Design a protein with these regions (language model features):
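Conserved beta-loop-beta/alpha segment of the NTase-like Rossmann-fold superfamily
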Residues: 1-62, 79
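Structural motif
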Residues: 17-20, 45-48, 56, 65-67, ...
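Conserved alpha/beta core of the MobA/IspD/sugar-nucleotide pyrophosphorylase nucleotidyltransferase superfamily
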Residues: 76-146
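Short, glycine- and charge-enriched coil/turn segments that flank and shape catalytic ligand pockets
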Residues: 11-17, 43, 61-67, 95-102, ...
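A residue-level structural signature of the nucleotidyltransferase/glycosyltransferase Rossmann-like core
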Residues: 26, 46-48, 67, 81, ...
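Short, hinge-like loop/turn segments at secondary-structure boundaries
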Residues: 38-39, 63-69, 138-139
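Short, flexible, basic/aromatic active-site loop/helix in glycosyltransferases
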Residues: 59-84
Length: 146
């Protein structure tokens, strides 16, 4: 909802170009990551920071039965920032808001689902963690003490 409000303000003010959307819960963003995202979004129109997963991933059903083990080399964990051509993300949100949004977990999903435009991964950092649990806070403190 906060992203949509910000996008509406940009649209009302006649802004164009690109927008980066970043979680406030990811304090370890670097200039290098921002530069890579900026360069990529100008070429591809939609990109997400992320990193390859280290663990094997299992897709399960509601009964927790394993249904699939995807090829780990093709699975990345998404981070932020996520960057988009402004008109693209605004139109994607306008379309998505007419539907159920409860399953949407990041802004790239809206573009993927609504626009059919490829979204590209940009290498981030394993240090670009999202601090949401007490365990995350322990890791963040360790990063700060290094």
């Amino acid at each position: 909802e906060s992203v949509w409000k910000a996008l509406c303000i940009l649209k009302e003010r006649g802004q164009s170009g690109f927008v980066m959307i970043h979680d406030g819960a990811r304090p370890f963003i670097t200039d290098e990551i921002l530069k890579r995202v900026y360069e990529q979004v100008q070429v591809q129109k939609a990109c997400v920071v992320g990193m390859p997963v280290k663990d094997t991933i299992k897709l399960i059903n509601k009964e927790k039965q394993i249904k699939e083990s995807p090829d780990r080399s093709l699975v990345w964990q998404a981070q932020t920032p996520q960057a988009f051509e402004l008109s693209l993300i605004v139109e994607a949100f306008e379309r998505q808001l007419k539907e159920d949004c409860s399953h949407i977990t990041d802004d790239a999903m809206v573009v993927e689902k609504q626009m059919g435009v490829p979204v590209y991964m940009v290498e981030g950092s394993y240090n670009n963690i999202k601090i949401t649990t007490p365990e995350d806070l322990v890791i963040a403190r360790a990063f700060l003490n290094v």
